[in-house]
Amino acid sequence: MAVPKKKTSKSKRNMRRSHLALGKVNVVVDAQTGEYKLPHHISLVDGTYNNRQVVMKKIDTEEVA
């Protein structure tokens, strides 16, 4: 079984982990709804992309009746 010959120092361990940090999420404010959304993604509130309606909202039959 493989066993390390020398103890890995805290410095070496942290240098190895330096690339594991998460980056910030880039969000923009939707011009039509004012909600936050990811750039180049469909707005989850009204289903628009680039000021065009691309996804129709589902209508609940219970609310209509």
UniProtKB/Swiss-Prot annotation:
<dbReference type="Pfam" id="PF01783">
    <property type="entry name" value="Ribosomal_L32p"/>
</dbReference>
<protein>
    <recommendedName>
        <fullName>Large ribosomal subunit protein bL32</fullName>
    </recommendedName>
</protein>
<dbReference type="GO" id="GO:0015934">
    <property type="term" value="C:large ribosomal subunit"/>
</dbReference>
<keyword id="KW-0689">Ribosomal protein</keyword>
<comment type="similarity">
    <text>Belongs to the bacterial ribosomal protein bL32 family.</text>
</comment>
<dbReference type="InterPro" id="IPR044957">
    <property type="entry name" value="Ribosomal_bL32_bact"/>
</dbReference>
<keyword id="KW-0687">Ribonucleoprotein</keyword>
<dbReference type="GO" id="GO:0003735">
    <property type="term" value="F:structural constituent of ribosome"/>
</dbReference>
<dbReference type="InterPro" id="IPR002677">
    <property type="entry name" value="Ribosomal_bL32"/>
</dbReference>
<dbReference type="GO" id="GO:0006412">
    <property type="term" value="P:translation"/>
</dbReference>
<dbReference type="InterPro" id="IPR011332">
    <property type="entry name" value="Ribosomal_zn-bd"/>
</dbReference>
